[in-house]
Curated annotation (Swiss-Prot):
Name used for this protein in its record: Large ribosomal subunit protein uL15
Assembly: Part of the 50S ribosomal subunit.
Species assigned in the record: Paraburkholderia phymatum (strain DSM 17167 / CIP 108236 / LMG 21445 / STM815) (Burkholderia phymatum)
A Gene Ontology molecular function term of the record: rRNA binding
Similarity annotation: Belongs to the universal ribosomal protein uL15 family.
InterPro entries assigned to the protein according to its UniProt record, in alphabetical order: Ribosomal_uL15, Ribosomal_uL15/eL18, Ribosomal_uL15/eL18_sf, Ribosomal_uL15_bac-type, Ribosomal_uL15_CS
PANTHER family: 50S RIBOSOMAL PROTEIN L15 (PTHR12934), LARGE RIBOSOMAL SUBUNIT PROTEIN UL15M (PTHR12934:SF11)
Lineage of the organism: Bacteria, Pseudomonadati, Pseudomonadota, Betaproteobacteria, Burkholderiales
Length: 144
């Protein structure tokens, strides 16, 4: 089997409906466009959202909110994920390289989900009270 030999199954494809080709086809004369009016003419279209001169919906509704340019991207990391990391010194770069947080994240916070049994050193990351207690109970520490 090769890509250039692939064909759709018999009867799976239908011929395109040819309009305006005689009365016997059922789509002759007006070709399914009806009689008169803007939509029957060639080039007879209106832009999307046009409501015949009435104020369109997207302009009747109020604008809401904005996109902050100073938004901080903070990633969340679970204790269980830190357990699986091969390194003992954990900082933002190590989390990004391991794929635990996205490249756009400017900081990260450790949350107390899962278990941590080994000793780690956390550098420059924040943590919840429960996560901080669990890390220190496992013999780990925080280096700010």
């Amino acid at each position: 089997m090769e890509l250039n030999n692939l064909k759709p199954a018999e009867g799976a494809k239908h011929a395109k409906r040819r309009v305006g080709r005689g009365i016997g086809s059922g789509l002759g004369k007006t070709a399914g466009r009806g009689h008169k009016g803007q939509k029957s003419r060639s080039g007879g279209f209106h832009k999307v959202g046009f409501e015949g001169g009435q104020m369109p919906l997207q302009r009747r509704l109020p604008k809401r909110g904005f996109t902050s340019l100073t938004k901080e991207f903070v990633g969340e990391v679970r204790l269980g994920d830190l357990e699986k990391l091969p390194v003992d010194d954990i900082d933002l770069l190590a989390l990004k390289q391991a794929g635990l947080i996205g490249e756009m994240m400017t900081s990260a916070k450790i949350i107390a989900t899962g278990e941590l049994k080994r000793k780690i050193v956390v550098k420059g990351l924040s943590a919840t009270k429960g996560a901080r207690a669990a890390i220190e109970a496992a013999g780990g520490s925080f280096a700010e």
